Amino acid sequence: MLIIPAIDLKDGKCVRLKQGRMEDDTVFSDDLVATAQHWVNEGARRLHLVDLNGAFAGTPIHKPVVEAIAKAQPELPIQIGGGIRSLETIEHYLEAGVTFVIIGTKAVQEPEFVEEACKSFAGHIIVGIDAMNGMVATDGWANVTDVKATDLAKRFADAGVSSIVYTDIARDGMMQGVNVEQTVNLAQYSGLPVIASGGVTNLDDVRNLKGQLGILGAITGRAIYEGTLNLREAQLLLDENRL
């Protein structure tokens, strides 16, 4: 299991939002390549990048920055989400050195697109499921749908999806702990590996996720930037064979 640092990109800076509200942001850095290098130095084995402007615009806005990070970290697996709505965009990112591309809104609006992407780019597609009270949200979390997160995950069980990134919006950026029950439920219901996101605040949250069936990793943002979670300590905890 991996602890995966999040680098959220907004207006060329690394920020953290609260519950996805673009106006409620905290800027942590304006040197994104250096931020990525910092987390690598701290022991990161994968990076999670989100183009926040892209998520709202419906098209990538931070392509050059993502390319620069990928070029600076050629051996590091990188996953990117936000505004990915075409096969051309996926191809562009993979050719630039990104390892995994996260499809979110488009997965809800056009599930066939995910299946097509999995056929074209096998092993490189992650579905991002963002949910408020168990219901899927789209377009940078601006719209909450009537689609259940578990039903959407099940829809892609046989599509060839690499994994699911599951974000509990109510917990995201709020430092209130991770929703272990819903995350594990999603993994068990879908049969797909799940990366937990939203609310990973301290080592207790990491302990609660450790050993849970189907949990591939946990994304953490505000906690590692504000210091309530030490990335290296968290990964060491997960690497131990004991709880």
From Swiss-Prot:
GO terms for cellular component: cytoplasm. Pathway: Amino-acid biosynthesis; L-histidine biosynthesis; L-histidine from 5-phospho-alpha-D-ribose 1-diphosphate: step 4/9. Transmembrane segments: none annotated. It catalyses: 1-(5-phospho-beta-D-ribosyl)-5-[(5-phospho-beta-D-ribosylamino)methylideneamino]imidazole-4-carboxamide = 5-[(5-phospho-1-deoxy-D-ribulos-1-ylimino)methylamino]-1-(5-phospho-beta-D-ribosyl)imidazole-4-carboxamide. The keyword Amino-acid biosynthesis applies. The active site is at D8 (proton acceptor), D130 (proton donor). Keywords: Amino-acid biosynthesis, Cytoplasm, Histidine biosynthesis, Isomerase. Its EC number is 5.3.1.16. Pfam families: His_biosynth (PF00977). Belongs to the HisA/HisF family. PANTHER family: 1-(5-PHOSPHORIBOSYL)-5-[(5-PHOSPHORIBOSYLAMINO)METHYLIDENEAMINO] IMIDAZOLE-4-CARBOXAMIDE ISOMERASE (PTHR43090:SF2). This is 1-(5-phosphoribosyl)-5-[(5-phosphoribosylamino)methylideneamino] imidazole-4-carboxamide isomerase. It comes from Acinetobacter baumannii (strain SDF). The gene is hisA.
